[in-house]
């Protein structure tokens, strides 16, 4: 705004000045108008509101507040570098986007929530507020939480790489090292930490997928003979299998596989922890290593853990991730089948959800969506 200031020209003769000589200059010594009661109330109300907001902003509250976090296109770049880098195999461009989704939150060790955060969380339809003890153990530190999340992220990247390469037909050799046994199973006391599984019932175990395939043919209670390398010597150990949670047979050991990757994959991402991006990492790698433009210009978001067999697992914060996806332009969302009960009734306008249980499901959904032939894709339903 431009303000023009006009200088007053003094009269040539004092008599030409119409003001009495003893007249006061405007505003000099004149009485100040008394504020009205309404003005006093309004001023007091504004002051009280400001004080209240200030108090709420610094008053700790025993809650954790989670809302939609940032999304990242796994086919895109981070600081000028591809989010997924591949060496040892050709990669192909894609015109679509595959967005991993996250949640952001305050509350818990190292990041306390304040009353204002909690109030905003209660008001926002896309946020959730829970007692902090329902989210974090009482005796855990922020450093321990961050370390755990970082480890889970690294594990999810390795699982995603193996699952994607196997999906594309690569062989991924693995050394199957026993990390421990399940208490109460027959393997407890028979197998030792550091044992390397090399065969089962005389069939070599060159990779993790072979072990999973062999166990699929075994019923709980069957006896299997495991050939292990222990202290540089080969031994046969007979183990009675037990029932695995979710069905099927298990040996009763924890396996820490060491993979010999046929392709070098590097995932460049910081500031995000946990395992829930695994499915989108795997799907992005599949698309990059496939000549076809499978996403074909569509923005697809999603979430889900993944294991080396390609099984998609449930995650937390699905509703917040749905909100973050539609906020960042996604038209489709790939949701773990085990999260479907939380999805129903909470899908934002403009977003279509596809239920996936495996990496194969996710890949087929991506291809169908990119081809414009997605009408028959399964969606989440109640029950």
How would you describe each model-predicted region?
Residues 308-335:
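Glycine- and Gly-Pro-enriched alpha-helical subdomains that act as flexible
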Residues 165, 187, 194-197, 226, ...:
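Terminal peptide-recognition signature
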Residues 1-41, 126-130, 139:
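Terminal targeting segments of Actinobacterial cell-envelope proteins
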């Amino acid at each position: 705004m431009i303000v023009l200031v006009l200088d007053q020209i003094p009269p040539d003769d004092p008599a030409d000045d119409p003001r009495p000589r003893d007249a006061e200059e405007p505003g000099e010594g004149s009485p100040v108008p008394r504020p009205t009661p309404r003005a006093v109330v309004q001023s007091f109300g504004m002051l009280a509101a400001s004080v209240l907001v200030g108090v709420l902003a610094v008053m700790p509250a025993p809650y954790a507040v989670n809302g939609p976090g940032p999304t990242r296109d796994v086919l895109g770049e981070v600081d000028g570098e591809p989010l997924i880098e591949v060496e040892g195999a050709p990669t192909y461009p894609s015109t679509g986007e595959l967005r991993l989704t996250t949640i952001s939150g305050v509350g818990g060790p190292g990041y306390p929530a304040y009353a204002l955060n909690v109030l905003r969380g209660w008001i926002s339809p896309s946020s959730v507020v829970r007692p902090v003890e329902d989210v974090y153990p009482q005796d855990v530190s922020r450093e321990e939480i961050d370390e755990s999340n970082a480890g889970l992220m690294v594990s999810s990247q390795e699982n995603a790489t193996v699952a994607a390469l196997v999906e594309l037909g690569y062989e991924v050799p693995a050394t199957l090292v026993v990390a421990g046994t399940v208490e109460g199973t027959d393997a407890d006391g028979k197998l030792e930490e550091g044992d390397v599984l090399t065969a089962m019932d005389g069939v070599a175990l060159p990779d993790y997928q072979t072990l999973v395939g062999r166990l699929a043919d075994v019923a709980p209670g069957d006896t299997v003979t495991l050939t292990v390398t222990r202290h540089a010597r080969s031994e046969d150990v007979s183990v009675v299998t037990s029932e695995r949670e979710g069905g099927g047979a298990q040996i009763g050991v924890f396996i820490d596989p060491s993979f010999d990757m046929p392709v070098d994959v590097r995932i460049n991402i910081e500031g995000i922890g946990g395992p829930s991006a695994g499915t989108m990492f795997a799907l992005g790698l599949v698309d990059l290593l496939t000549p076809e433009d499978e996403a074909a210009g569509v923005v697809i978001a999603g979430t889900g853990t993944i294991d080396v067999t390609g099984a998609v697992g449930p995650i937390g914060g699905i509703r917040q991730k749905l909100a973050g996806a539609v906020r960042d332009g996604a038209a489709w969302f790939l949701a773990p089948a085990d999260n479907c009960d939380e999805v129903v009734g909470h899908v934002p306008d403009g977003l279509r959800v596809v239920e996936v249980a495996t990496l194969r499901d996710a890949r087929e959904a991506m291809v169908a969506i990119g081809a414009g032939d997605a009408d028959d894709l399964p969606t989440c339903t109640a029950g």
